[in-house]
């Protein structure tokens, strides 16, 4: 092969090799381009980001209230939660106003049906398998019957225990814990309450007379005697209430029981495990009688107590000069005060004082516990909402309710009186529900009322009254 041909062939080989290399280079640089959509997932990257949780949802999630958080994020928008309870008229309006903002933020429609025959109607509905999603019980004893029958959802199955302990005094949780078919369970959450351990007095006249607020039972008795020595009767008392005559007397017994025996004994008493004939209950009645049965201490004397309508009992306190100076009753009684009297000027209140220092400063209450009968996510969300002070905030501003929630600010109250009562309850060593409302109806709304009325009227002695009350307790 001559040199020229060899050079030509070599040149062609080099050119061909370079051409192949160039083709290979094109493939190498194109490969990432053909894989780019998969490697960078461009379509996903260009999608709009998920909507951020609202501040309300974030706050709920931080508290462990996951269903409430989801509700604020709109997850249950368009759903309906049915409720029933005793709220009618003005109370129904206040309740609906208190949940209105929640409904607007979540899109959940809370349909509340109030009934003046609530106790009878709810039993019919539950027995017929037509229970609403949530029921508002003013009487925990009635709720306890449904819990025992296995009709109520245990809130411990979904609600944060840490949150409940953070937002309620232990006493509220104790009162919401009831015996179910499989043992103790969290039967509901407390949403609002009324305070009972209160003594009302005509503030301006009281101060003008030089009287001082008693801090103990002994000081209360000394004040009572001081007023008697001044020629007046200290106490305004009346227990007439139609078919319910006698109930104000049961409140006195309950308040004194809380101050003279243990919470365990009080709870046993409400369950029928501590008899009315026991020394503990008899002692409470005898302490009450020190005031009630002394004609120098009670306006109109003992004989007037049974015939005086409970709502009229405090009226003489506002005469000039007052015909009586002290009236023990719950915060609802202000609605019976004469028109035009001014809180903080014409009247005020003080805490019904402790008796035995061993039992501290307990507080007697009545109120509403919300229980869940149907288990769906949106119902769980509403129940978690009821465990927050926000659920009753609008009601506090409007007046007529107190909040059991630790996260409810005292600044939310539109009434100085109710704010002061709420503060007392926050400071209380323990809280217990009205005992007669925890007892079976035959006792709490029957023999207890009648026994106290007959004893106060002088128709029977104390031992007979206590024995007759015990005899009415249902035998299982």
Label the predicted regions.
Residues 100, 104-105, 128, 184, ...:
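Extracytoplasmic/periplasmic substrate-recognition and gating elements
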Residues 97-171, 175, 204-215, 316-318, ...:
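Extracytoplasmic "Venus flytrap"/periplasmic binding protein-like
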Residues 224-226, 270-306:
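Glycine-centered hinge/linker elements that transmit conformational signals in sensory
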Residues 269-270, 364, 396-408, 419-476:
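C-terminal capping/gating helix-and-loop segments adjacent to ligand/active sites or protein-protein/ligand interfaces
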Residues 77-88, 108-113, 134, 187, ...:
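Short, well-ordered beta-strand elements
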Residues 51-77, 141-197, 221, 227, ...:
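Hinge/lid segment of periplasmic solute-binding proteins
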Residues 70-75, 156-171, 239, 258-283, ...:
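Short, solvent-exposed loop/beta-turn-alpha elements that line the ligand-binding surface or hinge
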Residues 140-151, 156, 171-218, 239-269, ...:
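Periplasmic solute-binding protein
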């Amino acid at each position: 092969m001559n040199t020229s041909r060899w050079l030509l062939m070599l040149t062609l080989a080099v050119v061909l090799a370079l051409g192949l290399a160039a083709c290979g280079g094109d493939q190498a640089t194109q490969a990432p381009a053909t894989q780019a959509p998969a490697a960078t997932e461009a379509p996903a990257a260009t999608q709009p980001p998920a909507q951020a949780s609202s501040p309300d949802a974030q706050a709920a999630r931080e508290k462990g209230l996951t269903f409430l958080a989801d509700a604020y994020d709109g997850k249950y928008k368009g759903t309906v939660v049915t409720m029933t309870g005793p709220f009618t008229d003005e109370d129904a309006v206040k309740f609906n106003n208190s949940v209105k903002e929640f409904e607007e933020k979540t899109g959940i429609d809370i349909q509340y049906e109030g009934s003046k025959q609530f106790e009878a109607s709810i039993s019919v509905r539950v027995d017929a398998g037509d229970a609403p999603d949530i029921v508002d019980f003013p009487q925990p004893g009635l709720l306890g019957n449904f819990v025992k029958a296995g009709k109520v959802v245990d809130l411990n199955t979904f609600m944060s225990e840490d949150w409940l302990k953070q937002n309620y005094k232990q006493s509220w949780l104790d009162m919401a814990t009831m015996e179910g078919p499989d043992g103790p369970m969290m039967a509901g959450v407390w949403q609002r309450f009324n305070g009972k351990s209160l003594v009302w007095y005509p503030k301006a006249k009281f101060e003008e007379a030089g009287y001082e607020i008693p801090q103990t039972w002994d000081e209360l008795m000394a004040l009572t005697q001081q007023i008697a020595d001044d020629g007046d009767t200290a106490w305004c008392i009346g227990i007439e209430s139609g078919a319910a005559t006698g109930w104000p007397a049961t409140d006195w017994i309950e308040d004194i029981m809380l101050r003279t025996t243990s919470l365990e004994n009080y709870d046993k008493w409400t369950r029928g495990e501590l008899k009315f004939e026991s020394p503990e209950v008899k002692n409470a009645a005898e302490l009450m009688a020190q005031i009630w049965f002394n004609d120098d201490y009670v306006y109109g004397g003992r004989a007037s107590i049974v015939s005086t309508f409970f709502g009229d009992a405090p009226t003489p306190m506002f005469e000039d000069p007052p015909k009586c100076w002290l009236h023990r009753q719950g915060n609802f009684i202000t609605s019976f005060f004469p028109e035009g009297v001014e809180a903080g000027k014409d009247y005020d209140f003080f805490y019904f004082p402790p008796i035995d220092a061993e039992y501290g400063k307990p507080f007697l209450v009545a109120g509403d516990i919300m229980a869940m009968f149907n288990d769906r996510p949106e119902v769980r969300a509403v129940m978690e909402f009821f465990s927050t002070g926000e659920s009753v905030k609008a009601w506090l501003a409007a007046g007529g309710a107190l909040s059991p929630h630790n996260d409810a600010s005292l600044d939310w109250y539109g009434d100085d009186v109710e704010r002061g009562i709420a503060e007392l309850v926050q400071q209380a060593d323990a809280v217990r529900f009205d005992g007669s409302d925890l007892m079976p109806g035959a006792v709490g709304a029957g023999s207890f009322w009648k026994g106290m009325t007959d004893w106060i009227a002088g128709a029977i002695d104390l031992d007979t009254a206590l024995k007759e009350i015990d005899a009415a307790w249902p035998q299982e």
